[in-house]
Design a protein with these regions (language model features):
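Short, small/polar-rich loop/turn modules that mediate ligand/substrate recognition or access, typified
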Residues: 24, 110, 115, 186-188
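Active-site helix of classical SDR
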Residues: 58, 94, 102
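Short C-terminal tail/terminal secondary-structure segment
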Residues: 83, 174-176, 187-201
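Substrate-binding pocket helix/loop in short-chain dehydrogenase/reductase
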Residues: 34-35, 42-47, 156
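A conserved structural motif in NAD(P)-dependent oxidoreductases
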Residues: 145, 159-171
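Residue(s) in the substrate-gating loop at a strand-loop-helix junction
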Residues: 78
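Alpha-helical segment proximal to the catalytic Tyr-Lys
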Residues: 63, 107-108, 184
Length: 201
């Protein structure tokens, strides 16, 4: 993520539209590693993506949000922020830091009328799962399940209470709510979109 490119993009948006009402920060990906086998380079890459994937866009578009009638920033985060997994230690740590950053920005930007919230994703159906299915299907192991049946089996293995993966439009609806005037009195909050996987109170 290049800061200069974001600054250029923000300038182009300002010239065309004048301001923006909402900024959605969605830089993600999961790194499978334990503490012991996470390299220094992997730590830096993970923290850079999760932190500066929010910091740089927010810095670039903050002036445009400050002149909006209903400014909102929404960050896409993960349930790992509150429920770390030992096989995803770097990602879990970075996600927890991002959650704290959201709270901090919400407090600081409140006086400007800019709301800052986030959503915490559970397991959402996406292209990465299709790739994993295709890889399993092309392996030497017997594999006759359909993609849908394979996803359902994974949902059972993961003990997702709603017994299925989330659909992309479901977190999108949560993002729309937090970005819109419908949530005009909400800041520093998170919406859990995990199918009931959350164990926190």
């Amino acid at each position: 993520l290049e800061k200069e490119q974001l600054d250029i993009f923000a300038k182009a948006v300002e010239e065309r539209f004048g301001n923006i009402n909402a900024l959605i920060n969605n830089a993600g990906g999961g790194r499978v590693s334990t503490f012991s086998n996470t390299t220094d380079e992997a730590w830096v890459a993970e923290l850079n993506l999760k932190f500066f994937g929010v910091i740089y866009p927010t810095q670039a578009f903050l002036p445009l949000l400050e002149v909006s009638d209903n400014p909102s920033i929404v960050c896409v985060n993960s349930l790992l922020a509150l429920q770390p997994e030992p096989h995803m230690v770097a990602t879990s740590a970075a996600r927890a830091g991002l959650l704290n950053l959201v709270y901090s920005m919400a407090k600081e930007f409140a006086r400007k009328g800019i709301r800052v919230n986030s959503i915490l994703l559970g397991t959402i159906e996406s292209g990465q799962w299709q790739k994993r299915y295709d890889k399993a299907k092309s392996s030497n192991e017997p594999h006759t399940e359909s993609y849908e049946a394979w996803l359902n089996q994974l949902a059972k293995q993961k003990n997702i209470p709603l017994a299925r993966f989330g659909h992309p439009e479901e977190p999108a609806k949560a993002l729309l709510y937090l970005a819109s005037p419908a949530s005009s009195y909400t800041t520093g909050s998170t919406i859990d979109v995990s199918g009931g996987m959350a164990k926190h109170i």
